[in-house]
Swiss-Prot record:
Consists of four subunits. Coiled coil: none annotated. Keywords: DNA replication, DNA-binding, Nucleus. Gene3D superfamilies: 1.10.8.60, 3.60.21.50. One of its GO terms (molecular function) is DNA binding. One of its GO terms (cellular component) is epsilon DNA polymerase complex. This is Probable DNA polymerase epsilon subunit 2. The keyword Transmembrane helix does not apply. In eukaryotes there are five DNA polymerases: alpha, beta, gamma, delta, and epsilon which are responsible for different reactions of DNA synthesis. Pfam families: DNA_pol_E_B, Dpoe2NT. It is found in: Nucleus. One of its GO terms (biological process) is DNA-templated DNA replication.
Length: 534
């Protein structure tokens, strides 16, 4: 058989095989398949074709028409096999580079948004972002086993009712249209609510724009609330099972979710002692802080982590005329500390996440990376990434979200329920995971770019959520989720606390460098004074 005849036969075979599985290949996609398979025998062609089809079936596709680009990406993923070293398993995703996936209520699946994202959003973008938040929480509530016996009522039905109704249950977003007058809103309308002194608030933080379940009595167009509860938290495994999808919504070019990749899960199992270190509020202009950082770097040089994540603020004098000069000097100082250790940390990725008061960083979320002029001191010495805030980190099959913002006290300050200081960590962790969003506060309290609200979404939930906050250090795990919520605290303000995460073991170790040890050159492992295991 001549080459042309063989190509034609292969072309017909490929088209027929994909058609059997309800896929239609574009002309360019067929040409690429022929090019990829022409030099292989029949059995190899069959094996690779079946692998690609299985991979395509696991993805949420907009159409059954398959493009050349999709074939290339699918073949690349099928061909990827074996293990990689720890450094190549790590990826950092900028908030502004993430694909905007939305939940389609009609299709009941996540779909890629067709409209381009813009920094200059209009009013429709704000309403779209709010609807998406509501859709995600609502679809979790509708499939939650513990809520199956509840009959939910919409605001529209209540608004048109003139009857006295007992035990009304509404899923809605809490809003305040005027002082001391609260409403709950859903996609159909809004209804006024009234809280009593004995209204029972379940274990969470309830504030404006919280999406929650309200139960009470409806009379005279007002819902008098008896109980308020968050929607139960749903693990990533359950989310993907319910949506029947292994598609990657986290970040990067891979089509298959990292946690669903057998190759990455196998690679993670071989990284038993690999760790990631997280520090927040690292004042590079403070000599004592830099001594503590040097102590940490020296302590880990014999067994360096795969990544060290430094979160801002990076200057003790924010928003001053000399702030940028202090920062420039601080990064130069850090570079000098790293120079003699560069061989020890040649496989470690240093990640810098800006804080709320760092220069050139807008107050609107998400925030871009630090000024590029600071890169010049660090980049020639170590492998580093200047990330956005928030940012997403993938290590093997693990998904990690890092968010630097002092929102815990702000959230507590705007909460309508009374809380104790001791309960704040668990309440906050439950609230942020139930809302499936890093910043569920209203725009006038903490503004968010509506077209990039998806970058703050926690759907499905990650393996680890780092909420780098000035609040006291804590590590929490919420019932129903596999996610660890970890706050390393303020490194500079809280006597040099930091957190260490072991992804293979799914364990967080909360550590601290005692002030008395800063003049001692012993290994950092001897100065860890406490830890929590999960």
């Amino acid at each position: 058989m001549d080459t042309t005849a063989e190509e034609n036969a292969l072309r017909r075979e490929i088209v027929k095989t994909f058609q059997i599985h309800a896929f239609e290949l574009k002309k360019e996609a067929v040409k690429l398949c022929v090019k990829l398979f022409l030099d292989h025998d029949k059995e190899t062609r069959k094996k690779w074709t079946n692998k690609m089809i299985e991979l395509l079936k696991k993805q949420t596709l907009q159409s059954s028409l398959i493009s050349e680009e999709l074939i290339r990406d699918t073949f690349r993923q099928c061909k990827s096999k074996g293990t990689q070293d720890a450094g190549k398993l790590l990826n950092v995703f900028d908030a502004f580079s993430l694909q905007p996936y939305d939940f389609d209520a009609d299709l009941r699946k996540m779909v890629l948004r067709k409209e381009k994202t813009s920094l200059a959003a209009d009013s429709s973008s704000f309403s779209h972002a709010a609807r998406q938040r509501f859709f995600i929480v609502k679809q979790r509530a509708m499939r939650c086993a513990s809520l199956k016996n509840f009959k939910f009522t919409t605001c529209e039905i209540l608004g048109s009712s003139t009857k006295h109704l007992q035990s009304v249950v509404v899923l809605g977003m809490l809003t305040q249209q005027k002082a001391d007058c609260y409403h709950i809103e859903d996609l159909s309308g809004s209804v006024e609510v009234e809280f009593k002194e004995d209204t029972k608030f379940h274990h969470a933080l309830f504030h404006e724009h919280s999406i929650a379940i309200f139960e009470g009595t409806f009379e005279n167009s007002v819902l008098t609330v008896n109980e308020v509860a968050m929607v139960p938290v749903e693990s990533a495994e359950v989310t993907r099972k319910e949506l029947s999808s292994n598609e990657n919504w986290f970040g990067g070019d891979d089509k298959i979710a990292f946690r669903c990749s057998d190759r990455l899960r196998s690679a993670l199992a071989k990284q038993e002692d690999t760790s990631l270190v997280f520090l927040s509020d690292v004042f590079l202009d403070d000599k004592k802080v830099m001594k503590a950082v040097f102590k940490l770097l020296q302590g880990y040089k014999d067994q360096p982590p795969v990544a060290i994540v430094f979160c801002g603020n990076f200057c003790s004098r924010p928003r001053q005329t000399d702030t940028i000069d202090l920062l420039d000097r601080g990064f130069r100082w850090l570079a000098n500390q790293l120079t003699p250790l560069r061989k020890d940390y040649e496989k470690t990725q240093f990640i810098f996440v800006p804080g709320p008061d760092d220069p050139f960083v807008d107050t609107v979320l998400p925030r871009p990376h630090l000024p590029s002029l600071l890169f010049k001191h660090i980049s020639p010495i170590i492998s580093c990434t200047f990330a956005s805030n928030p940012c997403r980190i993938q290590f093997a099959s693990q998904e990690i979200v890092v968010f630097r913002s002092d929102l815990i006290k702000k959230t507590c300050r705007h909460s309508i329920n009374s809380i104790t200081v001791e309960s704040i960590p668990s309440r906050y962790a439950r609230s942020v995971l139930s809302q499936a969003h890093l910043c569920p506060l209203p725009q006038h309290i903490t503004p968010v770019l509506p077209d990039f609200s998806h970058s703050l979404s926690l759907h499905p939930l990650p393996d680890l959520l780092i909420t780098a906050d000035r609040f006291e250090t804590f590590t929490e795990k919420v019932v129903g989720a596999d996610t660890i919520v970890s706050n390393p605290g303020s490194f500079s303000r809280s006597n040099y606390t930091f957190h260490v995460y072991y992804p293979c073991q799914n364990r967080v170790e909360a550590s601290q460098i005692p002030v008395s040890e800063l003049d001692d050159h012993s290994n950092i492992k001897n100065v860890i004074i406490f830890f929590f295991l999960f």
